[in-house]
Amino acid sequence: MRRAGLGDGAPPGGYGNYGYANSGYNACEEENDRLTESLRSKVTAIKSLSIEIGHEVKNQNKLLAEMDSQFDSTTGFLGKTMGRLKILSRGSQTKLLCYMMLFSLFVFFVIYWIIKLR
């Protein structure tokens, strides 16, 4: 149903775009289309970047979980070793403790010497 006075939908005055000259209106539309396309490409770039960040965060969380479990197992291993050393130090085996310290000192010296030669 058409309203009275609107005719076929074109405004009066010979302008087809509600009082704007065709060239000015088309220029505005082209600029809007260009800006819209520019905005669309920026939004797409930001979306892909955020997806990549999400994947990286998931990978880093997985690596952190693996490191946490490895640290827990290492903590348990070191705790057992320290317990054994405490038992060894409580006993009257000072000779064995001295040998163990000399051996570890020798191993560190050999490692230092190997690294120094490189």
Curated annotation (Swiss-Prot):
Keyword Ubl conjugation: no
One GO cellular component, as annotated: cis-Golgi network
Domain t-SNARE coiled-coil homology: 26-88
InterPro entries with a match to the protein in the record: BET1_SNARE, T_SNARE_dom
Protein location: Endoplasmic reticulum membrane; Golgi apparatus, cis-Golgi network membrane; Golgi apparatus membrane
Topology class, membrane: Single-pass type IV membrane protein
Residue numbers carrying Phosphoserine: 50
Entry keywords, A to Z: Coiled coil, Endoplasmic reticulum, ER-Golgi transport, Golgi apparatus, Membrane, Phosphoprotein, Protein transport, Transmembrane, Transmembrane helix, Transport
Keyword Endoplasmic reticulum assigned: yes
Vesicular side: 116-118
Top-rank lineage group of the source organism: Eukaryota
Disulphides: none
GO molecular function: SNAP receptor activity; syntaxin binding
Transmembrane spans: 95-115
Family, as annotated: Belongs to the BET1 family.
Reported function: Required for vesicular transport from the ER to the Golgi complex. Functions as a SNARE involved in the docking process of ER-derived vesicles with the cis-Golgi membrane.
Quaternary structure (record): Interacts with SNARE complex members GOSR2, SEC22B and STX5. Interacts with LMAN1/ERGIC53. Interacts with STX17.
Identification of the protein by name: BET1 homolog
Annotated organism of origin: Rattus norvegicus
Origin organism lineage: Eukaryota, Metazoa, Chordata, Craniata, Vertebrata
Name of the gene encoding the protein in the UniProt record: Bet1
